[in-house]
Amino acid sequence: MRRLDDTGPHPPIKGAGLRLAVLSRGPRLYSTRRIVEEARRRGLRVDVCDPMKFSLTISDGSVDVLHKGEAFSYDAVIPRIGHSITQHGVAVLRQIEQLGMWTANSGQGILQSRDKLHASQILARNRMPVPKTAYVRDIIDVEHAIEMVGGLPVVVKVTQGTQGDGVFLRHTAFEVRNLVQGLLLTGKSV
């Protein structure tokens, strides 16, 4: 049996001075620490960079990225952009992409993954199985939406959210209508 930390059939990456930046607000988070540990174990030089400490400049034919006032230049970037700073983090990541640095995830990919409806549309377009989904913007469409997805009970989701936030199980049409109405009134997409 192979251990999870086994490098498997792929030879270990030889860092030889390669520089890796991990964009993360939480250097003490387990996932960030593990990325740093593995990168160092493989000989890479790695820094954790807070996405909120970046400045971006754009001029005719030129873009630049500064982190804490210093020029930002790495061979590769692993973004760990939290939901609360998605827009800013993606703006930073897009500028990094413009400079030609390799990124593990694109800014566009992060945005697509944060929108549950858009992610489902992409999966369906690529013939990946997805649960039956209905998107409503008016309370009058709730009954039809329940029928379209196969009846009760239903899972109601807001399109934006991570780690289960904005996901609700409802067993009656009355519960679904009340929930959807409340979410729509607060400006959520359902």
Q: Can you say where each PLM-predicted feature lies in the sequence?
A:
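Active-site nucleotide/adenylate-binding loops and adjacent lid/helix of ATP-dependent enzymes
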Residues: P12-I13, G17-R25, Y30-E37, V46, ...
